[in-house]
A protein has these predicted regions:
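Long, position-biased, composition-driven segments near the start of the mature protein
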Residues: 34-36, 45-349, 353-392
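Classical eukaryotic N-terminal signal peptides for Sec-dependent ER targeting/secretion
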Residues: 1-41
């Protein structure tokens, strides 16, 4: 009797950020497609270099994630670029060239929004989504650490989704990963299988997400130019998070567990792991400012210089304690809190010192479950009461 099982060999160090070398390993057909891809990106760069100063863009491409289920496709089942909200001119051109990629982009944005809500569900700003062009409301226009996290997570979502779509054969211009064999993989282990195409996912996300910022030209050293640099930095940090958390996974094949053959491939981490990683980066984000030469520099010289994988921000976070429509803050009134916690989810911090209300709540749940032969589980319904604490 044959047996097989999957295990992770090594995480993080195995997969390096050597993307150009990986692309050179492609077949001639894939290389030709990649050459066309780079030509397109070059055209975008040329067009944006001489662009005049443009006003802030209306909306954000991240809104695609909110429309993923109902408005993404036309009658032929192909994404309609005209129907996609918040795209810049460069993103619209990429959409027209890579229409089959837009479902993956929207899925990536969708999972980023869901992950943002999960990671911040017990914080003062809980990643509330608003039905407007900016998704998060006016708060996303503030160069805060919350904005840095949201943009990084969205960029990571595109890498993650496109890389998986390549592996699953959903896109015409890419397939399984062609990453070279890791040097530290055991000699008798076979490097193959169909791995997630991180290389392609990274490059496509870089072009699609960043072209929006590269089209915007502002006077060197201005706050507007600094915001563009901040966005580009955090976009890159998000993409690198997916690379950082990726792993080499191996499968053992053999009769009766003999493990006579081991095959290995490149695999994405779960997006929850990426979200956890970026949340830690959010907690350690570095405040920066733009200097006269048009470069970002740390505001406090005593702080360690951030790497390309770290998040940066330019403005302090607004007051999320009270409702403020001007900045898009919903406040924390009515939010459920943890009375016994001393962390940010505790009633003292989450309620901003305003106190909290306590209500008795009755919960019905299954209990005392027993297995009955054959083949069902019988349970009783138990009723219990619990205290629910909400911010005043």
């Amino acid at each position: 009797m044959s047996a097989s099982w999957v295990f992770v060999v090594r995480q993080e160090e195995t997969i390096k950020m050597q993307l150009p070398e990986k692309f050179r390993r492609k077949s001639s057909a894939a290389a030709a497609m990649q050459f066309f891809y780079y030509v397109v990106l070059s055209l975008f760069s040329i067009n944006s270099t001489g662009a005049a100063r443009r006003p802030p863009l209306n909306g954000t491409w991240i809104r695609m994630g909110m429309l993923f289920d109902d408005k993404m496709q036309n009658d032929q089942g192909i994404p309609s670029c005209k129907a996609l909200p918040g795209l810049s001119s460069g993103q619209k051109r990429l959409c027209q060239l890579y229409m089959d990629h837009m479902n993956a982009v929207a899925l990536g944005a969708n999972q980023a929004l869901s992950e943002c809500k999960y990671q911040f569900h017990n914080r003062r700003w809980n990643c509330s989504l608003l039905d407007d062009v900016n998704v998060f409301g006016p708060v996303i226009t503030i160069a805060s650490r919350e904005t840095a996290f949201a943009l990084a997570l969205a960029a990571a979502g595109v890498v993650h989704s496109v890389a998986r779509a390549c592996r699953d054969g959903q896109l015409t211009s890419c397939g399984c990963s062609r990453m070279g064999r890791p040097k530290d993989l055991k000699r008798d282990w076979v490097w193959g299988g169909c791995g997630d195409n991180l290389e392609y996912g990274y490059k496509f996300a870089q072009s699609f997400v960043d072209v929006r910022e590269r089209e915007r030209k502002f006077k060197r050293g201005t706050r507007e130019q600094g915001r563009v640099l901040m966005n580009l930095h955090n976009n890159e940090a998000g993409r690198r998070a997916v690379i950082k958390k990726a792993k080499v996974t191996c499968k053992c094949h053999g009769v009766s567990g003999s493990c006579s053959l081991i095959t290995c491939w490149q695999q994405l981490a779960t997006f929850r792991e990426v979200g956890d990683y970026l949340r830690d980066k959010y907690d350690g984000a570095t405040e920066v400012r733009v200097n006269r030469r048009g470069r970002l520099q740390i505001r406090d010289p005593r702080v360690t210089i951030p790497t390309a994988s770290d998040l940066v921000y330019m403005e302090d976070s607004p007051n999320y304690c009270v409702k403020d429509d001007k900045i898009g803050s919903l406040g924390t009134q009515g939010r459920q809190c943890n009375r016994t916690s001393q962390d940010i989810d505790g009633c003292n911090l989450l309620c901003c010192g305003r106190g909290y209300n306590t209500l008795k709540s009755t919960i019905r749940e299954r209990c005392q479950c027993q297995f009955k032969w054959c083949c069902q589980v019988e349970c009783k319904t138990c009723i219990r009461s619990m205290d629910v604490h909400t911010c005043k």
